């Protein structure tokens, strides 16, 4: 596999993207603490019997393992090593709480990842990280591509996710994660971010 080198424009953009992540996550945390998280935390405490927050090991930039944080959307007896997107549809439905389904449809469960962005584990936009305990196939697929997803910070949303269909397929994800790194840039990130917002509102409206 050939070594990939970022373009000059990408090298300039990457520190700027990190600055956006720091400032954006600080603003987001303040807003969420004020208007959102307190009531989600209280409701989820009752629903999950006192376990409202969930942490799971994921692979980040340069394959470094970090703990991604989110509001718990699954029952306590769900497999802690599997992300909901890695479960088959029947298992996901049986393990999902009623309130958890709402959190996932609206993507509110992902908002705690603002803390991951702040500390530098993640970015707003980037390849979506899979669970560290079940990502071997995805890692193999990603490493077949140049560039690959592990060259950049993983994101809350990514290019593979907005492609919608078959986004759970490792080959599909690896291909579009590689394409994201190739096209990495400010306006491309804005486009992915905007499409993500439309997709979230569309999913919530559709339910």
Regions found by a protein language model. Give the residues of each.
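Active-site alpha-helix of zinc metalloproteases
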Residues: 17, 96, 115
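Short, glycine-rich, amphipathic interfacial segments at transmembrane boundaries or analogous
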Residues: 53-95, 156-175
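Hydrophobic structural segments characteristic of membrane proteins
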Residues: 2-5, 112-207
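Short phosphate-engaging motifs
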Residues: 38, 95, 110
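A hydrophobic, helix-centered structural microdomain
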Residues: 4-78, 186-207
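Alpha-helical coiled-coil
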Residues: 99-100
């Amino acid at each position: 596999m050939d070594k990939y080198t970022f373009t000059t424009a990408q090298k300039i953009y990457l520190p700027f993207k990190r600055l956006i992540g720091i400032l954006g996550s600080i603003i987001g945390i303040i807003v969420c603490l004020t208007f959102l998280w307190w009531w989600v935390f209280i409701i989820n405490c009752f629903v999950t019997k006192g376990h409202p927050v969930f942490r799971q090991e994921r692979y980040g930039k340069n394959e470094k393992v970090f703990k991604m944080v989110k509001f718990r959307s699954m029952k306590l007896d769900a497999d802690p090593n599997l992300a909901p997107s890695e479960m088959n549809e029947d298992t996901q439905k049986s393990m999902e709480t009623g309130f958890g389904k709402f959190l996932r449809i609206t993507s509110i469960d992902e908002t705690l990842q603002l803390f991951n962005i702040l500390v530098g584990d993640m970015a707003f936009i980037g390849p979506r990280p899979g669970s560290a305990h079940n990502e071997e196939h995805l890692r193999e697929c990603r490493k077949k591509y140049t560039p690959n997803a592990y060259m950049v910070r993983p994101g809350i949303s990514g290019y593979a996710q907005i492609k919608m269909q078959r986004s759970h397929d490792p080959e599909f994800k690896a291909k579009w994660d590689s394409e994201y790194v190739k096209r990495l840039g400010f306006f491309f990130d804005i486009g992915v971010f905007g499409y993500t917002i439309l997709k979230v509102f569309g999913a919530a409206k559709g339910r």
